[in-house]
Amino acid sequence: MSKPIRVRYAPSPTGLLHIGNARTALFNYLYARRHGGTFIIRIEDTDRKRHVEDGERSQLENLKWLGMDWDESPETHENYRQSERLALYQQYIDQLLAEGKAYKSYVTEEELAAERERQEAAGETPRYINEFIGMSADEKAKYIAEREAAGIVPTVRLAVNESGIYKWADMVKGDIEFEGGNIGGDWVIQKKDGYPTYNFAVVVDDHDMQISHVIRGDDHIANTPKQLMVYEALGWEAPEFGHMTLIINSETGKKLSKRDTNTLQFIEDYRKKGYMPEAVFNFIALLGWNPGGEEEIFSREQLIALFDENRLSKSPAAFDQKKMDWMSNEYLKHADFETVYALCKPFLEEAGRLTEKAEKLVELYKPQLKSADEIIPLTDLFFSDFPELTEAEKEVMAGETVSTVLQAFKAKLEAMSDEDFKPENIFPQIKAVQKETGIKGKNLFMPIRIAVSGEMHGPELPNTIYLLGRDKSIEHIKNML
């Protein structure tokens, strides 16, 4: 009988939720939900130097915003933070010490640095050399006594089987193996401050929580042999491992970096700019996984039903901000008006634009929005000075038929009564100008659009003119003549 599927997302509360970590959480979530398993949130907070106040809350809030839920977490279960599990780690460290599978190491940071420098100068691969090699029992006892008398606090190191082979069938990359002799020597499982290192604590946690599958980024591949060593030392069965490919910047082809200013990399950024969470969820789900076919827009329920771990990509996933914005626009275009207006409202309110026209303006620009904050620059025409024309727009307005078109359309607007001034009546007036002047197509519509709005492209022209108002529209046209 196969083990129940239990997967986890285990963030460190060291900052905001990054797109890469969000993908790790999302793939674990989809895997659990697809197979009727359990999705667990565990907080790995043993790195006290990098601990950020509110880091845990930020992680959980942003996961919830994306639409993920979980079955077990620090919110519902005790000891789901590593800082609450120190006694458990100590229990297993003591066991390994008692069995001779680990030992206390008194070498100082200065000595380690000097040895590393010597090895590099000699062209050797840096590795820890067991400080007790060649010592008799008496010499070892004397060495330890002297070090402790000098106040040196030891670390605890795992005794590595240098001839061991550590291999696994990776869910994404296939068979991977490491030789024990290439790990870098005996490695620290407990730091001087008493906290366990990541590669030790994560094994204890995964075993204790009965994790069946560990799905994470391939930057963790080098950690896996060390973790397999701990499973071996403690006599435990290891879970299955799957290492997702890196996310790269589609423009540079390099690993996505926090210095890449052409991308929004933190979930908080998408929240602040007014993206729909469903769009961000959909986009992240396709970073390194492909359901097959041409379709790219999927609901959360569809993604759960379609998710197949065998379709996780072996090639790097390209993060394309333009693709994200295209997908976001698709979601906003097809969302109900109330949803989009609720996203836009805070931005309109902050800008002092929550007027009687606010709903109409959101309706007008809804098809263009990639994020709700764009409602402000898009509606500048209605609240700010007329924009400066671009060179391309000036070129259009220099056309020989422009004056004829604008004079004729201005006359049509002036002749309209207040009662008749409605979007459905404005378009026939433009067509009437075409009939009277014989000017049509771009030569007709483009000068009117630029004269009224200062832009070559935009929403439906009659609606723009209506919301701008007859007097304002006439004023703008006069200024162009």
UniProtKB/Swiss-Prot annotation:
Chemical reaction(s) catalysed: tRNA(Glu) + L-glutamate + ATP = L-glutamyl-tRNA(Glu) + AMP + diphosphate
UniProt keywords, alphabetically: Aminoacyl-tRNA synthetase, ATP-binding, Cytoplasm, Ligase, Nucleotide-binding, Protein biosynthesis
Family: Belongs to the class-I aminoacyl-tRNA synthetase family. Glutamate--tRNA ligase type 1 subfamily.
Pfam families cross-referenced by the UniProt entry: Anticodon_2 (PF19269), tRNA-synt_1c (PF00749)
SUPFAM superfamilies per UniProt: An anticodon-binding domain of class I aminoacyl-tRNA synthetases, Nucleotidylyl transferase
GO molecular function: ATP binding; glutamate-tRNA ligase activity; tRNA binding; zinc ion binding
Location in the cell: Cytoplasm
Binding partners and assembly: Monomer.
Name this polypeptide is given: Glutamate--tRNA ligase
Motif 'KMSKS' region boundaries: 255-259
Span of the annotated motif 'HIGH' region: 11-21
GO terms classed as biological process: glutamyl-tRNA aminoacylation
HAMAP family given in the database record: Glu_tRNA_synth_type1
EC assignment: 6.1.1.17
Residues holding ATP: K258
Primary location class: cytoplasm
InterPro entries associated with the record: aa-tRNA-synth_I_cd-bd, aa-tRNA-synth_I_codon-bd_sub2, aa-tRNA-synth_I_CS, aa_tRNA-synth_I_cd-bd_sf, Glu-tRNA-ligase_bac/mito, Glu/Gln-tRNA-synth, Glu/Gln-tRNA-synth_Ib_cat-dom, GluQ/Sye
GO CC entries: cytosol
Keyword ATP-binding appears in the UniProt entry: yes
